[in-house]
């Protein structure tokens, strides 16, 4: 038996929305350069970009696995794997990101809706504390904007709020859900500052410069 729809469900992206993933990438680059040298660093990011083009999402561990097939006897690669898995993601949460989740919970269910691989992205959600903060309501797809029918099955609602740093994703979801969706564009991270992004995809319903500014927004009209 299907669940009755809630008045509103709040969906949050992870990377550069709740968590500073640009900083994570910088830390990985610095670690590779410092401990493994420029050649390893350059090759890793070359493979990473190739894999992102193939898969449509960032796969840090997948890039390492593919690198390993080219350098099977390089034992340093195993240490890189341990470093990635044990990365302190909680230290990279944006200020007031957990407060923003709690703020929205006053009006409805709060969930994570993210893209990524099946290992590193869930690990990121868990070690950052986001998994617990949303009561395990975590959905991770390859292209989340193509999975909205499944999102509706898991979290049926009369209205949705999507908080994301990518206008492209918000615009694609708006085309599908229309007036049932309120889009919130968080201008954090490199994607949010691409030249001409708002002209290309149109403005979101709400635009904020940082996730903490969500605390000043009242969504009570969505949950009468």
Please report, for each region that a protein language model flagged, where it lies by residue.
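Active-site neighborhood of HAD-like aspartate-dependent phosphohydrolases
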Residues: 1-46, 69-70
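Asp-based, Mg2+/Mn2+-dependent phosphohydrolase catalytic module
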Residues: 1-7, 126-162, 166-224
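Conserved SAM-binding loop
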Residues: 18, 110, 162
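A metal-dependent, Asp-based hydrolase signature
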Residues: 24, 35-38, 48-85
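Helix N-cap/beta->alpha junction signal
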Residues: 94, 114-116, 166
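Substrate-recognition/cap helix-loop segment adjacent to the acidic, metal-dependent catalytic center
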Residues: 101-111, 115-139
């Amino acid at each position: 038996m299907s669940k009755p729809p809630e008045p509103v469900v709040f969906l949050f992206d992870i990377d550069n929305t709740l968590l500073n993933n640009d900083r994570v990438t910088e830390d990985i680059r610095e670690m590779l350069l410092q401990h493994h040298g420029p050649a390893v660093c350059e090759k890793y990011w070359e493979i990473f970009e190739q894999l992102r083009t193939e898969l449509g999402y960032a796969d840090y561990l997948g890039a390492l696995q593919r690198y390993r097939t080219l350098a099977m006897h390089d034992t340093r690669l195993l240490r890189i794997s341990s470093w990635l898995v044990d990365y302190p993601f909680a230290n990279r949460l944006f200020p007031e990101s957990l407060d923003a989740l709690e703020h929205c919970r006053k009006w409805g269910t709060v969930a994570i809706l993210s893209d990524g691989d099946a290992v590193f992205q869930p690990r990121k959600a868990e070690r950052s504390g986001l998994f617990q903060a949303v009561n395990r309501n975590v959905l991770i797809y390859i292209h989340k904007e193509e999975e909205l029918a499944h999102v509706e099955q898991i979290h049926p609602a009369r209205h949705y709020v999507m908080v994301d740093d990518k206008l492209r994703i918000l615009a694609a979801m708006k085309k599908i859900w229309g007036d049932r969706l309120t889009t919130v564009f968080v201008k954090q991270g490199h994607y949010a500052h691409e030249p001409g992004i708002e002209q290309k995809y149109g403005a979101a319903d709400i635009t904020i410069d940082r996730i903490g500014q969500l605390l000043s927004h009242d969504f009570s009209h969505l949950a009468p």
